[in-house]
Amino acid sequence: MSQYRTFAAADAVEYARQFGGVDNPNSLVDALEVGDGNLNLVFRIFDTAGVSRVIVKQALPWVRCVGESWPLTLDRARLEAEVLIEHGKFCPQHTVNILHYDPLLAVTVMEDLSDHAIWRADLVKGIDWPQAAGQLGDYLAQTLFHTSDFFQHPHQKKADVIRFTNPELCDITEELFFNEPYEVHARNAYPRALEPLAESLREDHELRVAVAGLKHRFYSNAEALLHGDVHSGSIFVAEGSLKVIDAEFGFYGPIGFDIGSALGNLLISYCAAPGLLPPREAADAREKRLNDVRQLWQSFAEGFLALAAEKSRDRALAVPGYASTFLAKIWRDSVGYSGTELIRRTVGMSQVADIKGIQDDAMRVECVRQAITLGRSLILLADHVADIDALIARIRQNG
């Protein structure tokens, strides 16, 4: 790791000239640092015409918003690149194309998606991409099926579980999803007016037991190679296109975690809409988010079952009916994990633009209250929400 150095813009340009795959490398002349996350530098590389041509991303050895007191492994750059390369084998149409990565410098070069929009940014503005949820469901079906026991040879699967072991970033997930929102913690960031509600989460024994079960399955169930951080801020959308990026939290874990994270993000948008948009537009946006929830699950479920029927390699798992049984288990997990996503994004430190963008303080409090209440309900009732219709009915009942 002695070769590691933090890139400046000029370093990113020079690196892109070497590994960006452009026809005329010397045409790359400028870089703009555009990263808005806490873990990485992200440079957009421009040519002489001012056109963005390629992305150079470098992992930082610490969390940006905290500093050197929160160090992080640089191996996550390798993990992210290899997860995306692996996912790209099975779903290239919805996975960002990795052009090159260097584990010693913790640098990845990838395709530029400047012709796409970040899905979350458009959701906040009330812009709808009706195809996106179905495309995301397809991505999840393809990547999670093909890296599961249904398809992988058991020897390869066991080797890949080791190859993609990601303890440091999993530790962050475990803290932010399953521990800190249910404790008095300095990193929690909910509105002061909701202290009684936050306290009720800490004191709800039934809820804490359910969260413990979700955390235990996150620890123990190496079902498929997860993206590990599926949310609308790590998804780019354009007409007819969806691309998933930012897989540094990837590891072998429970399939329902990726599905639930995606569903939970759509539900955050659902809860936030009244604070971001005029009443009529907000009501319309909420209906569209419920349709997205339906489309995402149906696309995933139909895709997974079709792949299982056609491509299962394990003789026992290929027995007719087993894939449906397994899918029912994924469904229960997905509902529960969607609840933890809602709570960690509103009680915990990982606040998102959907909530932060609400200008009216009282409205923000009410939107956060609704998200927390819905999250709690989904965690507690995950085993009793029979299907997608029941889930949508439960969401409507929450308000």
Swiss-Prot record:
It catalyses: 5-(methylsulfanyl)-D-ribose + ATP = 5-(methylsulfanyl)-alpha-D-ribose 1-phosphate + ADP + H(+). Keywords: Amino-acid biosynthesis, ATP-binding, Kinase, Methionine biosynthesis, Nucleotide-binding, Transferase. Pathway: Amino-acid biosynthesis; L-methionine biosynthesis via salvage pathway; S-methyl-5-thio-alpha-D-ribose 1-phosphate from S-methyl-5'-thioadenosine (hydrolase route): step 2/2. ATP binds at N40, K57, E111, D112, L113, D246, A247, E248. One of its GO terms (biological process) is L-methionine salvage from methylthioadenosine. Substrate binds at D229, R344. The keyword Transcription regulation does not apply. GO terms for molecular function: ATP binding; S-methyl-5-thioribose kinase activity. It comes from the Bacteria. Its EC number is 2.7.1.100. Disulfide bonds: none annotated. Homodimer. HAMAP family: Salvage_MtnK (MF_01683). PANTHER family: METHYLTHIORIBOSE KINASE. NCBIfam families: MTRK. Belongs to the methylthioribose kinase family. Catalyzes the phosphorylation of methylthioribose into methylthioribose-1-phosphate. This is Methylthioribose kinase.
